[in-house]
């Protein structure tokens, strides 16, 4: 009697065969001709691949979302990357594809990889060369075809998401023998004239031959030499060109590039509101810590009232000083005018005229008396005899001498009186001039003192005002700088935590090959199982050969 293994269910046997195939053929590359191609509305592609002797069924799940630019057809020569598995309901093995390359594209892919490695070694893809995009660009340059749907998508997104912008379109050919030269010349011209704050290099989807102009070295070098940040938006999300690695930012689609380059208006408003709330909160916190000092300065720094009160007090002080100066000047001016009018009056002239008239009256009186006496003498002479003539002459001479002495004495008195009056007038004039000079000097000293006091008072108030204003401005600037530094720190932290930037630092993410969920624990892995690893610039399929549990090692 022979012993035999226990019977197995069909499902169990099929699962065993499936596990064996998937563990040993987790990544295969098959070349052949497509047959029985069927693209379902769900986006899945079912096909057969054959050569002259064999036939293999296959499936490409979510094919339409990855390769919607070109639809495969029967008879196409292709190269398929995927894994072998078993379709249990029919009990047939098949290939589940995750990449499809048309025949003839293989040489281009090899050239793509060789050029990529060489340019990366020369530093054209270095992360430290990447430029930061402006937050709110005023001018946006777009290098693309002017007649395609790409430019319409970009304009539609910008008009919906931005308040105001200026867009410059540089028309180029995006496919063909001259496309690479036109694209590089467009980048150079935009930089030479400094026409934009940011550039979008855009093209719609296509095959690798259609997109090959963006893999040329001349375009990569033009992007590397650009001083204007460049966003690469070539093809679809699954399409990669060398321009994507050389550009400062890669966008999966042209519409996404427009969204990246210009935040939406609502987002900008929300960001500004959040910044405003943040600044208000920290301003209140800072001001509350200095409430005692502010209370001491409250009477001086009570918002605008302090400055108005200070200006009003300063104006009153200026007005008071000006009135005082005007009053003193008016008083001294009146006294000066009185002295001037008195000096310019005809008092002295009238006194001279009066003395002259008095002198004329005296002379006329003596002349009249002398004439009368002479007249009388002539009459006496006629009446006198000769013997009395000698006696009369002697007597007349005596009268003449007496009259002359009296006249001389009176003239002396008048002359002395006139001299005395002139001396008094001279002394009075000198004294008046001295008092006027002294008053003028006193007025000048008072004016200088008032001017100096006024200037010192004004300077003191101005210094207090400027000092208080500078203190407030310094406090506000200090507060704004602190908040700006905190904003930059948070922005850098946010950039560092961005998953795309994490990929750029050398990290990767593992996904289950079938279920498409992230693997975060070594316990979820099995030997000989296939996993997909996502890197910065693409994906790869790996086979698990060994598992080490860190917790087991620590224990």
Swiss-Prot record:
Principal location: cytoplasm
Keyword Cytoplasm: yes
GO molecular function: exodeoxyribonuclease VII activity; nucleic acid binding
A GO cellular-component term linked to this record: exodeoxyribonuclease VII complex
EC number assigned by the record: 3.1.11.6
Record localization: Cytoplasm
Reaction equations catalysed: Exonucleolytic cleavage in either 5'- to 3'- or 3'- to 5'-direction to yield nucleoside 5'-phosphates
Keywords recorded for this protein, A-Z: Cytoplasm, Exonuclease, Hydrolase, Nuclease
An example Gene Ontology biological process: DNA catabolic process
InterPro entries: Exonuc_VII_L (IPR003753), Exonuc_VII_lsu_C (IPR020579), OB-fold_nuc-bd_dom (IPR025824)
Record keyword Nuclease present: yes
Oligomeric form and interacting partners: Heterooligomer composed of large and small subunits.
The protein's role, per its UniProt record: Bidirectionally degrades single-stranded DNA into large acid-insoluble oligonucleotides, which are then degraded further into small acid-soluble oligonucleotides.
HAMAP family: Exonuc_7_L
Protein family: Belongs to the XseA family.
This protein's name: Exodeoxyribonuclease 7 large subunit
């Amino acid at each position: 009697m022979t012993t035999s293994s226990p019977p197995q269910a069909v499902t169990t046997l099929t699962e065993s065969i499936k596990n064996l195939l998937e563990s040993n053929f987790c990544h295969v590359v098959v070349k052949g001709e497509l047959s029985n191609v069927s693209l379902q509305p769900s986006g899945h592609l079912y096909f057969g691949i054959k050569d002259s002797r064999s036939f293999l069924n296959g499936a490409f799940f979510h094919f339409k979302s990855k390769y919607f630019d070109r639809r495969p057809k029967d008879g196409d020569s292709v190269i398929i990357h995927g894994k072998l598995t078993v379709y249990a309901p029919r009990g047939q093995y098949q290939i589940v594809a995750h990449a499809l390359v048309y025949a003839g594209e293989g040489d281009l892919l090899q050239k793509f990889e060789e050029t990529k490695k060489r340019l990366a070694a020369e530093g054209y893809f270095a992360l430290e060369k990447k430029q930061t995009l402006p937050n709110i660009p005023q001018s946006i340059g777009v290098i693309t075809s002017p007649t395609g749907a790409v430019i319409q998508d970009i304009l539609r997104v910008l008009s919906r998401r931005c308040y105001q912008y200026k867009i410059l379109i540089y028309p180029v050919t995006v496919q063909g023998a001259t496309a690479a030269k036109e694209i590089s010349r467009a980048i150079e011209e935009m930089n030479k004239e400094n026409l934009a704050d940011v550039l979008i290099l855009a093209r719609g989807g296509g095959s690798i031959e259609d997109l090959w102009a963006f893999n040329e070295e001349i375009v990569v070098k033009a992007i590397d030499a650009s001083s204007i940040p460049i966003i690469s938006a070539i093809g679809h999300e699954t399409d990669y060109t060398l321009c994507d690695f050389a550009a400062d930012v890669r966008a999966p689609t042209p519409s996404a590039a427009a969204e990246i380059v210009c935040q939406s208006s609502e987002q900008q408003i929300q960001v500004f509101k959040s910044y405003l709330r943040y600044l208000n909160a920290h301003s209140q916190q800072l001001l509350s810590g200095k409430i005692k000092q502010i209370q001491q300065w409250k009477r001086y720094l009570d918002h605008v009232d302090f400055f108005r009160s200070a200006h009003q007090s300063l104006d009153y002080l200026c007005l008071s000083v000006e009135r005082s100066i005007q009053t003193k000047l008016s008083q001294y001016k009146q006294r000066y005018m009185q002295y001037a009018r008195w000096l310019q009056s005809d008092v002295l002239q009238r006194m001279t005229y009066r003395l002259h008239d008095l002198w004329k009256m005296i002379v006329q009186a003596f002349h009249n008396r002398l004439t009368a006496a002479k007249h009388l003498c002539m009459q006496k002479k006629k009446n006198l005899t000769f013997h009395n003539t000698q006696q009369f002459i002697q007597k007349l001479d005596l009268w003449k001498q007496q009259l002359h002495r009296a006249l001389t004495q009176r003239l002396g008195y008048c002359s002395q009186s006139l001299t005395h009056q002139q001396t008094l007038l001279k002394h009075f004039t000198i004294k008046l001039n001295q008092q006027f000079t002294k008053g003028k000097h006193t007025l000048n000293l008072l004016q200088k003192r008032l001017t100096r006091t006024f200037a010192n008072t004004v300077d003191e108030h101005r210094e207090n005002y400027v000092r208080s204003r500078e203190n407030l401005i310094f406090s506000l600037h200090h507060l704004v700088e602190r908040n700006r530094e905190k904003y930059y720190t948070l922005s850098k932290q946010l950039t560092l935590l961005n998953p795309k930037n994490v990929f750029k630092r050398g990290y990767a993410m593992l996904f289950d090959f079938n279920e498409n969920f992230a693997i975060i624990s070594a316990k979820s892995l099995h030997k000989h199982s296939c996993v997909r690893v996502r890197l910065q610039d693409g994906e790869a399929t790996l086979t698990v050969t060994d598992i080490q549990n860190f917790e087991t090692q620590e224990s």
